[in-house]
Swiss-Prot record:
Residues the entry annotates as binding ATP: 346
Organism from which the protein derives: Chloroherpeton thalassium (strain ATCC 35110 / GB-78)
A family per Pfam: tRNA_bind
Protein task: Is required not only for elongation of protein synthesis but also for the initiation of all mRNA translation through initiator tRNA(fMet) aminoacylation.
Protein name: Methionine--tRNA ligase
Cofactor binding mode and count: Binds 1 zinc ion per subunit.
PANTHER family (UniProt xref): METHIONINE--TRNA LIGASE, METHIONINE--TRNA LIGASE, CYTOPLASMIC
GN (gene name): metG
MF annotations from Gene Ontology: ATP binding; metal ion binding; methionine-tRNA ligase activity; tRNA binding
Keywords of the record: Aminoacyl-tRNA synthetase, ATP-binding, Cytoplasm, Ligase, Metal-binding, Nucleotide-binding, Protein biosynthesis, RNA-binding, tRNA-binding, Zinc
Needed cofactors: Zn(2+)
Recorded family membership: Belongs to the class-I aminoacyl-tRNA synthetase family. MetG type 1 subfamily.
Binding positions (Zn(2+)): 146, 149, 159, 162
Localization, UniProt: Cytoplasm
C-alpha cells in the first residue's frame, strides 16, 4: 500500500516575457494535466499548482524597449498564457504569479530563515555601474565592441554577429544601455547559496531515486554532482524582483536571483489556493506532510533546478526546523518537441503559439496530437500533416465514428433508450483484447508514460468500432431484434467506457459523449469514488434514457485548413534563411594568409573518441573532455557547453588538432583542440567523421 495519501503536482512556471508555444505545452503542461485528471478520475486527493515566473532581466529589457513598467509586461503575458491554458483544458487548481504579495512574502521568509541559520555566504565582486542612472548593470545591460569579430554592438553576454559568448568585462569600449555612458567597475556585495554544503545529501537523494526517475534526470544530476557543487549567487542588483528583506546599505537595491525565487512560487501558489478554499493553513498539509507525494513536471532544460537546487533550498529550510518540507518524489522531465523538423524558437520567430492555434482548431485535437507524440525519452516532432492525419484517421474515423453510430442507431431504432441489459457475462466475453487494456492504461499513466496511455486509449476505440462493424446491428435488427438490442446495449456501455478512458486526454470530447449518453456531470465526478474502476464493468442499465442529442465529435481537417499554416512555415523558413544568409555574409571572416604545403603538413588532425565529458565549474562555456587518441588518452577543454550536454558527446568520435601546444584554461591544461563549425543558426557543431572511423587515425 502506498505511503502517500495525497499528490501535489507542479508544472514549471512559464516565463512571462512571451506567449506559450506548442513545445512548452507538449513537454510540461499537457502531460501534467493528463496525469492529474487521471488521479481525479480515480477519486484521489490531488492538486495541480502552476503560475507565471515574472522576474528577471529579460522582462526588464522588454519593458525598457517598450517604454512601460515590468508589471505591464508580466500582466500581459500572464493573462494571455493563463487564458490559453484554460481554453486548452489545462486544469490548474491554482495558477499564481511570482509578482504577487504572497509570493514576495514567501520568498523573503525563506531567505531570512536560511540567512539566520548562517548558511548563506557573502562575497564582494566587481560589476559595471552606471554613475548617471546609479544602477549596477547586469551583462545584458552593457553593450560594446566584440573582442572577437569587432562588432560595435555586441551585448555583454553574447555577440549576436559572431555568436561568441562573452562576459561584460570582455567588451571593448563598454557602454550602458540605460544612458549610453561608459560604466565604471564598482564593488558590490552579494549573497551566495553554498550548494556544496549539501553535496553528500544531494548525492544520496539522487541515487535513492536512480531506479525510478527518468535516465535523463539522473544523468544530468550526476554530471553536476560529479563536477562538484559550488556557491551560487542568490541576489542581483536589479530594480525589479523580490527585494532582499534586510536593512542597511548592503541590501539596498538588491533582489533575489530568479533561480532562487521562482521555484518558491510553487509554495506561494499553493498558499493562495488554500486561501481560496477558506482554509489558509491547508497548504501545509501538502508541503509539510510525509504523506504527500510531490511531483515536478518540467522540460529537460530545467532538471538541475528541480532535481538539485530546489531540494537543496528545502534541505536548508528544514535544518533545525519543526515543520519539514517534503522533497520531490519524481521529476518527469521531457525531452523537446520540435516543429516540422526544427527546434521551436521564440527568438527566431519559429513557433506555433498556443493562443493562436486555439483560434483555428479545437483544443482536444491538439491535446491528442501532442500527447501521442509526447517527447518522453527522445525529441519528437509536431507537423501539420501528422496533426491532420491523426485527427482524421484516429479521432474522427475511429472514436468519433463509433460513438455517433452507436448513439444515432439507438435514438433511431430504440427510442433513445438502452434497449437491453448488458450482463457481466456478455461483458467478460469481450476477452483480453478489451479487458487487458485497463491495466496497461493505468500503469502507463501512473508511470508518466503518456504516449503509451494514448495508444491504449485509441486501441479501446478501435476495439469498440470493430465490435459494432462486425456485429452489424443494422442487419441483425431485421430478423433478430432482441439480439440487435443486446448488441446496442453493449455498444452504449463501450461508449461510456471510452468517455471515461479518454476523459484525461480529451476532456471536452469526453463531456460531449457523457452528455449524449445522458450521464450527468454529478455521476461523472464524485469525490473519493474511483470511476475508472467502475467502468471496468457495464454501467448503463436497460431503460436508461439517452439525452437525445447527437453531434459529430470531430470535424475532418481538410488540406485547405492547414495550407495557410504550411504557407506560414514556408515564409518563416524563407525569412530565417535570408537572415542566416545575411548573417553568414556579415560574419564571413577573411581568408587567412596563404601557407605552404609543408606548413600545412605540420598540423596533425586525428580522430579521437570522447570517453568522459563534464562541465567545467564556474563557467557556462567550457566542457572538459577525456579523449582516446590511439594508444593514449588526453584532457581537452572545448567551448561547447552552450551547444552540447555532456551526455551528448559521450562516445562520439571527433576531429582534433593533436599536436597543438598545451594551454592552461581555468587552471586546467588543454592538450589539443576539438574542431567545430558554426551552423546557420549560429550554433557550434563538433566535427564528427561519418562511418566507422578508426580512433587515432590521421585526418587526410
Amino acid at each position: 500500500m502506498s505511503q502517500y495519501k495525497r499528490t501535489l503536482v507542479t508544472t514549471a512556471l512559464p516565463y512571462a516575457n512571451g506567449p506559450v508555444h506548442l513545445g512548452h505545452l507538449a513537454g510540461v503542461y499537457l502531460p501534467a494535466d493528463i496525469y492529474v485528471r487521471f488521479k481525479r478520475l480515480k477519486g484521489e486527493d490531488v492538486i495541480h499548482i502552476g503560475g507565471s515566473d515574472e522576474h528577471g532581466v529579460p522582462i526588464t529589457l522588454t519593458a525598457d524597449k517598450e517604454g512601460v513598467s515590468p508589471q505591464v509586461v508580466v500582466d500581459r503575458y500572464h493573462n494571455r498564457n493563463s487564458e490559453a491554458f484554460a481554453k486548452c483544458g489545462i486544469s490548474f487548481d491554482h495558477y499564481g504569479r511570482t509578482s504577487s504579495p504572497v509570493h514576495h512574502e514567501t520568498a523573503q521568509e525563506f531567505f531570512l530563515d536560511i540567512e539566520k541559520k548562517g548558511i548563506f555566504t557573502k562575497k564582494v565582486e566587481k560589476q559595471f555601474y552606471d554613475e548617471e542612472s546609479r544602477h549596477f548593470l547586469s551583462d545584458r545591460y552593457v553593450t560594446g565592441t566584440c573582442p572577437v569579430c569587432g562588432n560595435p554592438d555586441a551585448n555583454g553576454d553574447q555577440c549576436e554577429k559572431c555568436g561568441t559568448y562573452l562576459s561584460a568585462n570582455e567588451l571593448i569600449n563598454p557602454k550602458s544601455k540605460l544612458t549610453g555612458k561608459t560604466p565604471i567597475l564598482k564593488e558590490t556585495l552579494h549573497w551566495y547559496f553554498p550548494l556544496g554544503r549539501f553535496q553528500k545529501k544531494l548525492e544520496d537523494f539522487i541515487e535513492g531515486h536512480a531506479k525510478t526517475w527518468r535516465q535523463n534526470v539522473i544523468n544530468y544530476s550526476r554530471t553536476w554532482l560529479r563536477q562538484g557543487l559550488g556557491d551560487r549567487a542568490i541576489t542581483r542588483d536589479l530594480p525589479w524582483g523580490v527585494k532582499v528583506p534586510l536593512e542597511g546599505e548592503e541590501a539596498k537595491d538588491k533582489v533575489l536571483y530568479v533561480w532562487f525565487d521562482a521555484v518558491l512560487g510553487y509554495i506561494s501558489s499553493t498558499k493562495e489556493w488554500a486561501a481560496k478554499q477558506g482554509q489558509p493553513d491547508l497548504w501545509k498539509t501538502y508541503w509539510q506532510s510525509p504523506e504527500t507525494r510531490l511531483i515536478h513536471f518540467i522540460g529537460k532544460d530545467n532538471v538541475v533546478f528541480h532535481a538539485l537546487m530546489f531540494p537543496a533550498i528545502l534541505m536548508a529550510k528544514n535544518e533545525n526546523a519543526d515543520a519539514q518540507y517534503v522533497l520531490v518524489d519524481n521529476v518527469p522531465a521531457s525531452e523537446f518537441m520540435n516543429f516540422e523538423g526544427k527546434k521551436f524558437s521564440k527568438s527566431r520567430n519559429y513557433a506555433v503559439y498556443l493562443h493562436e492555434f486555439l483560434e483555428k482548431f479545437p483544443a482536444d485535437t491538439l491535446r491528442y496530437s501532442l500527447a501521442i507524440n509526447y517527447p518522453e525519452s527522445r525529441d519528437t516532432d509536431f507537423s501539420w500533416k501528422d496533426f491532420q492525419n491523426r485527427t482524421n484517421g484516429e479521432l474522427a474515423d475511429t472514436l468519433g465514428n463509433f460513438v455517433k453510430r452507436a448513439v444515432d442507431f439507438t435514438n433511431s431504432k430504440f427510442q433513445g433508450e438502452v434497449p437491453a441489459e448488458c450482463t457481466i457475462e456478455d461483458w467478460n466475453a469481450l476477452g483480453e483484447g478489451w479487458h487487458g487494456g485497463f491495466k496497461k492504461y493505468e500503469e502507463a499513466l501512473e508511470n508518466f508514460h503518456i504516449r503509451e496511455a494514448c495508444f491504449t486509449a485509441m486501441d479501446f476505440a478501435r476495439f469498440a468500432n470493430r465490435y459494432l462493424t462486425e456485429s452489424e446491428p443494422w442487419k441483425v435488427i431485421k430478423t433478430e431484434p432482441e439480439k440487435a438490442a443486446k448488441i446496442m446495449a453493449m455498444a452504449l456501455n463501450l461508449c461510456e467506457t471510452l468517455a471515461t478512458v479518454f476523459a484525461p486526454i480529451l476532456p471536452e470530447t469526453s463531456a460531449k459523449i457523457f452528455d449524449m449518453l445522458g450521464v450527468s456531470e454529478a455521476a461523472q465526478a464524485k469525490v473519493g469514488e474511483n470511476l475508472f474502476e467502475k467502468v471496468k464493468a457495464p454501467q448503463l442499465a436497460k431503460g436508461h434514457k439517452l439525452s437525445g442529442k447527437s453531434e459529430i465529435l470531430f470535424r475532418k481537417i481538410e488540406d485547405a485548413d492547414i495550407q495557410p499554416e504550411l504557407d506560414k512555415i514556408a515564409a518563416m523558413l524563407a525569412a530565417l534563411e535570408q537572415k542566416e544568409a545575411e548573417k553568414a555574409t556579415e560574419n564571413f571572416e577573411p581568408i587567412k594568409p596563404t601557407i605552404t604545403f609543408d606548413e600545412f603538413e605540420k598540423i596533425d588532425l586525428r580522430v579521437a573518441k570522447v570517453l568522459e565529458c563534464e562541465r567545467v565549474p564556474k563557467t557556462d562555456k567550457l566542457l572538459r573532455l577525456k579523449v582516446q587518441l590511439g594508444t593514449e588518452t588526453r584532457q581537452v577543454l572545448a567551448g561547447l557547453a552552450k551547444y552540447y550536454t555532456p551526455e551528448a558527446l559521450l562516445g562520439k568520435n571527433v576531429v582534433m588538432v593533436a599536436n597543438l601546444a598545451p594551454r592552461k584554461m581555468r587552471g586546467m591544461e588543454s592538450q589539443g583542440m576539438v574542431l567545430a563549425v558554426e551552423d546557420a543558426a549560429g550554433c557550434l557543431q563538433a566535427l564528427s567523421p561519418e562511418g566507422d572511423s578508426i580512433v587515432g587515425k590521421p585526418v587526410k
